[in-house]
Each structure stands twice: as structure tokens, then as C-alpha cells.
């Protein structure tokens, strides 16, 4: 079997969820969209369900996958519904839905639901993606609040620049949301991962932690709060070949690395098709049997190469750790000019092993 794999620590996942609850002082929906940011939505939801207040996903397909796996906790559709027919599935499977467009509000007002629906009404406070204008937001609340098919309303918005701790935009959004939602008797939801980790003055009834659940830092630098996060995913493989190169010999496509000294090269079974960033620069650190070694040469589809010259004990079969407790995925993403979100969600073909939960079992694969 090819040795590349992702190990998922479910106890670290639970720790990060508890941290989100503690920082928020509120209920929290665990965001498990995009296959739990590449960690496996079903195993992660199963591990969190005994203590989670609920879950959030992007769309109904992701919600139904959780329901079919036996998840009974509340599940919120963050993008709401795309077709009117989905409303019957939402009611049938006891899902919660966001209403973020005038079309969704009209559809909810006209829907004869077999059971009252819990709706999260979304205001655009400055993200300018999904969300109702302040005027439409107030009108939608007035229109929906007394309808028999609406069980309750939660008022929400989404922070656009909370990962920039010196940016005033977050406070401006919070004020705009408070001014519009003031006087509306309903629970509120404002804080995402950076909002929880970096903006303690913000308050809401429901938080929506996503990236932080998986132990990744949304900020360029560590803070007192982000230092408490535990990485959930460890990306590992092994050395599959070792060769010695003389001075002047290149490594990999495009000869991006040329040996300036006699160089001992280790070939690792891990490439960009596995989700490792293709444009990771020379010198990017990896751990080989616990010792830091630099990446050399361009990352290929299925392989990458590291400099073992200063680690003479390393040989074929040595364990290579690409990210996890060290190196962390956040600094790696910054070094490669991508986001941690993109790296974590990009692991499409790797098998995953799970530790830290008797409910799920020790090993599960994609």
C-alpha cells in the first residue's frame, strides 16, 4: 500500500470545539462543510455529536449524508436551498435553513410545511456575498416571524475581515448588524473562527466555528487563543528511495534545485495530487523521523524530494511528516501563498485514519 495518509485526531477535534464554546460563551454549530474541511464529515460529526449543539454544512447534499449516517443533531444549511423542492426535504429531515436572498424568503413565506421550520435570516453587513440588505432583512423578519410554517428565526451575518486583527471593518459590521437587528426579538449569530479567536468583545447566541475546529490558525501570527488550538490532521508518508547527487546536478521538473554540495536526496510518496502544495518553495520544512529537512525541487503529482544530507541516518522507509503538530499547516500555507482552508480541503485521494474515538473506531478510510 502507498504510505501517504492523513491521520485525524478526534480528541483534538473535541478539544478545539470546547475551546470555541469557551471563547464564545454561547452555543456553537460545528461547521463540517466540504467534508469537514477535508477531515471526513461523518466521522467528525459522530465524534462531536455527544457534545455539539449542532452542525453547519453548505448544502442539502452534505446534510443528507450526515442524516443517513445517523446524525440526529440540528444541521444548518449555510447556503440555504436552491430549488423550492428542497424545502420538503428540509422539513422531512428536520434541517435548519438559512434564508439569505429575497427569493428564499418568498419561497418560505409560500411554503405549506408539514412541520414548522427553523430559519436563520442572514443580513449582508459588508461581506457582499450572500445576505439581505438591511431594509430587506427587516422586511423579511416582519414577514416571516408570525407565519405558522416558521418555528423560530435566528438573525445572522458573516464577518468578512475578522482574520485581520488591526482592521476596523469587523467592528463596523458588528455595529451595522446590531443597529439593524436591534429590537428584533430573536437569537443572533455573528462569530466565525477568527471572530471567536480574535474579537472577544463580540457577543452572540450562536457561534459558527469552522477552521479552528481543525486546529488551524486563521491569523498570520499566533495569539494567546490560537496557541491553545490542537492540530487535528497529521499528513504523513515515507521515503521510498534515497540517492546521492554530485555538485551541479538538478532535481525534479524545471531544475528548480541544483546541488551546490554533494547532496543526499530522499524521494517521498506525496505529491500535489494528494493535496500537498505544488509550488512549495525550496527549503519548505518537513520532518523526517522527527528531524527537520528541507524540501528541494518542484513538487510532482505523486512525489516530492527532500534534502537528507544533514540527516545521514534517514533511509528508505523513514517517516515523513508534511504537516501536523510540526510543521503547522498555517505557516506552510502562507509560505506557499495559499490558505490553510485550501490545503485542508484539497486532500482528495488520501486514505484517512482516525484516532481518539471509540465510537468511530481506530481506522477508517475514504
Curated annotation (Swiss-Prot):
Annotated InterPro entries: Ala_racemase, Ala_racemase/Decarboxylase_C, Ala_racemase_C, Ala_racemase_N, Ala_racemase_pyridoxalP-BS, PLP-binding_barrel
Cysteine disulfide links: none
Entry EC no(s): 5.1.1.1
Active site: 33, 253
Gene3D superfamilies: Alanine racemase (3.20.20.10), Lyase, Ornithine Decarboxylase, Chain A, domain 1 (2.40.37.10)
Annotated GO biological process: D-alanine biosynthetic process
Named cofactor requirement(s): pyridoxal 5'-phosphate
Keywords on record: Isomerase, Pyridoxal phosphate
MF-aspect GO terms: alanine racemase activity; pyridoxal phosphate binding
Catalytic activity: L-alanine = D-alanine
Domain of life of the native organism: Bacteria
Job description of the protein: Catalyzes the interconversion of L-alanine and D-alanine. May also act on other amino acids.
Protein name from the UniProt record: Alanine racemase
Organism, scientific name: Xanthomonas oryzae pv. oryzae (strain KACC10331 / KXO85)
Source organism phylogeny: Bacteria, Pseudomonadati, Pseudomonadota, Gammaproteobacteria, Lysobacterales
Name of the gene: alr
